[in-house]
A protein has these predicted regions:
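Glycine- and small hydrophobic-enriched segments that form the cores of compact globular domains
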Residues: 75-89, 110-117, 121-125, 149, ...
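Secondary-structure boundary elements
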Residues: 131-138, 201, 205
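Active-site microenvironments that recognize anionic phosphate/pyrophosphate groups
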Residues: 1-98, 206-213
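Active-site helix/loop of acyl-thioester processing domains in fatty-acid/polyketide metabolism
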Residues: 120-136
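C-terminal helix-cap and adjacent tail motif
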Residues: 47, 162-213
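Short histidine-centered catalytic/ligand-binding loop motif
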Residues: 101-125, 176-184
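A short glycine-rich, hydrophobically flanked beta-strand micro-motif that places a catalytic Asp/Glu
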Residues: 137-150
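Histidine-centered divalent-metal-coordination microenvironment in nucleic-acid enzymes
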Residues: 105, 147-175
């Protein structure tokens, strides 16, 4: 049996929509969990749309036009840590979580096209960051996300899930995050500092302005 085409996948899903073109809300799954941020009674999915003709272009598809074509700016306000091969940026433009940090290689690649040397370092870097994030007093767990639908250059998001706020667990965390009050920039900087120090101790490099405020 050959792998399923997107047309067949869509047709199989579309066979389950109602007269209004919507799939039913799966209340027995995550929408029924206590950590789901929305009340289910008034919740409905948007009508299902057919596949687009092509995948949309992403930022940085052309390596020459990607941000990595330029050297790291050591004066960037969002830069938390960097070395010769990687950088970490702190989410200063509005975070509802104790910390949201973006890990990216400086060589142009995505997850499926990483050179072996980059892939070999990735796990160690993620482990260092996760350990430092989970050491913050306001954090109960580090969460890791990779999407890549907007940008072609690999970027992993590490988030600090707030400690003991049990509604904010699991995959709905980002839905909660967008509705939480913004954390003050000085608090984000103080939370980023021990993470940057841990990276510098384990992987060398330099601590950026975002962790020196």
């Amino acid at each position: 049996m050959e792998p399923e085409s997107i047309e067949d996948y869509y047709e199989r899903i579309a066979a389950h929509v109602g007269a209004d073109g919507r799939l039913p809300v799966a209340v027995e799954e995550m929408p029924g969990w206590d950590i789901f941020p929305y009340e289910v009674d008034s919740l409905r999915l948007k009508p299902l749309q057919p596949p687009a003709a092509t995948e949309p272009a992403r930022r940085g598809e052309d390596a020459a036009a990607c941000w990595c074509a330029n050297p790291v700016d050591p004066d960037s306000d969002s830069l938390m840590w960097w070395n010769e091969r990687w950088k970490v940026d702190l989410g200063f433009e509005g975070s509802g979580l104790p910390i949201m940090a973006w890990l990216s290689p400086l060589v142009h690649c995505d997850l499926g096209t990483m050179p072996p040397a980059v892939a070999a370092e990735l796990g160690s870097l993620v482990g260092t960051m996760a350990g430092a994030i989970e050491g913050l007093p306001s954090v109960g767990r580090a969460q890791l996300a990779k999407y890549g639908d907007g940008g072609a250059h690999l970027h992993l998001l590490l988030m600090g899930r707030p400690a003991r706020m049990l509604q904010l667990r699991g995959s709905p965390l980002l839905d909660w995050e967008e509705n939480l009050p913004r954390v003050p920039s000085e608090v984000l900087a103080s939370n980023g500092r021990p993470v940057a120090r841990a990276l510098a101790e384990a992987h060398g490099g330099w601590i950026g302005p975002a962790a020196q405020r």
